[in-house]
UniProtKB/Swiss-Prot annotation:
Keywords: Capsid protein, RNA-binding, T=3 icosahedral capsid protein, Virion. The keyword RNA-binding applies. InterPro entries: Levivir_coat, Phage_RNA-type_capsid. Gene3D superfamilies: MS2 Viral Coat Protein. GO terms for cellular component: T=3 icosahedral viral capsid. GO terms for molecular function: RNA binding; structural molecule activity. Pfam families: Levi_coat. Belongs to the Leviviricetes capsid protein family. Capsid protein self-assembles to form an icosahedral capsid with a T=3 symmetry, about 26 nm in diameter, and consisting of 89 capsid proteins dimers (178 capsid proteins). Involved in viral genome encapsidation through the interaction between a capsid protein dimer and the multiple packaging signals present in the RNA genome. The capsid also contains 1 copy of the A2 maturation protein. Acts as a translational repressor of viral replicase synthesis late in infection. This latter function is the result of capsid protein interaction with an RNA hairpin which contains the replicase ribosome-binding site. It is found in: Virion. Homodimer. The capsid proteins form dimers that assemble by group of 5. Twelve such pentamers are linked together with free dimers. The homodimers binds to the viral RNA via an operator hairpin, but also to many other RNA sequences in the viral genome; this interaction probably shifts the virus from the replicative to the assembly phase and ensures specific encapsidation of the viral genome. The keyword RNA-binding applies. This is Capsid protein.
Length: 131
């Protein structure tokens, strides 16, 4: 797939579009970034696909979102990353899987991330343990 702009919505009360623009392709990993004008504060999304030696297809999506604040040292204001969140999603398919099967697997994962599915939402958003 051609590396291109990727627009992702957040979950604010009024969702914001986050536009990631192509930055680079290195070792078959495409990278798009949400540019803030300061590279240290850029959110990054990467996507890759590789075929393993045993014929499986593995695709990985990664989202890296830093939180940046201004810091003043000796009267000089500079941006500094105060924390970073990471999400990694791995897909691992048998070479005999069909397009329909793969599409359904992706749909189930996308559906699992809906805010009204409390098991997943409470675990990954509210940081509640599974009991």
């Amino acid at each position: 797939a051609q590396l291109q702009n990727l627009v992702l919505k957040d979950r604010e009360a009024t969702p914001n579009d986050h536009t990631f623009v192509p930055r680079d392709i290195r070792d078959n990993v495409g990278e798009v970034v949400e540019s803030t004008g300061v590279p240290i504060g850029e959110s990054r999304f990467t996507i890759s696909l590789r075929k393993t030696s045993n014929g499986r297809y593995k695709s990985t999506l990664k989202l890296v979102v830093p939180v940046v604040q201004s810091q003043t040292v000796n009267g000089i204001v500079t941006p500094v990353v105060v924390r970073t969140s990471y999400v990694t999603v791995d897909f691992d398919y048998d070479a005999r899987s069909t397009t329909k099967e793969r599409n359904n697997f992706v749909g189930m994962i996308a559906d699992a991330l809906k805010a009204d599915l409390m098991l997943v939402h409470d675990t990954i958003v509210n940081l509640q343990g599974v009991y």
